[in-house]
Amino acid sequence: MESFSSKSLALQAEKKLLSKMAGRSVAHLFIDETSSEVLDELYRVSKEYTHSRPQAQRVIKDLIKVAIKVAVLHRNGSFGPSELALATRFRQKLRQGAMTALSFGEVDFTFEAAVLAGLLTECRDVLLELVEHHLTPKSHGRIRHVFDHFSDPGLLTALYGPDFTQHLGKICDGLRKLLDEGKL
């Protein structure tokens, strides 16, 4: 007997459509203004660090695609109880990473690239486990690309260095606002 599910088909079509349209207009349906500002700053940091506009655009586009796909999966109730526990764990790790990044940005001489890189790597691993059965290997590659890029000790060291002070300040302001509003 053939198993057919219109809900599954609709979800698959929605993910496919959104993956093709991961531009600003679609992103604003899922990503608020503060998050958008943080993403813009992360783009600028990536562009300055890599000296490559296309590479910086690719990493932010991958981040947006993954965020939208995970939001769609969550909104459609695609996660089972064990996956919801993983989603909670991911959110806690992401929140811990944001608070650590803020702390490093606010207290001089406390920055440790290995600590922040480790937290981002843990976030990546939990997210990959969460979406293992829901997203394609290509999407898994996007997750790895995003987290590997931002957990690069060289990039983190540059971000907390003197050349990126203005960017770090804006990122910290955005993270603080997202934490205060309970969005992170």
Swiss-Prot record:
SUBUNIT field: May interact with CASP8; however, such result is unclear since PubMed:19079267 could not reproduce the interaction with CASP8. Interacts with RAC1.
Tree of life domain: Eukaryota
Organism: Homo sapiens
Source lineage: Eukaryota, Metazoa, Chordata, Craniata, Vertebrata
Keywords annotated in UniProt: Cytoplasm, Immunity, Innate immunity, Lysosome, Nucleus, Phosphoprotein, Ubl conjugation
Gene name in the database record: TNFAIP8L2
Functional summary from the UniProt entry: Acts as a negative regulator of innate and adaptive immunity by maintaining immune homeostasis. Plays a regulatory role in the Toll-like signaling pathway by determining the strength of LPS-induced signaling and gene expression. Inhibits TCR-mediated T-cell activation and negatively regulate T-cell function to prevent hyperresponsiveness. Also inhibits autolysosome formation via negatively modulating MTOR activation by interacting with RAC1 and promoting the disassociation of the RAC1-MTOR complex.
Main location: cytoplasm
TM spans (from-to): none
UniProt effect for mutating S3A: Complete loss of interaction with BTRC
Post-translational modification remark: Phosphorylated by TAK1/MAP3K7; this phosphorylation triggers association with BTRC and subsequent ubiquitination and degradation.
Name of the featured protein: Tumor necrosis factor alpha-induced protein 8-like protein 2
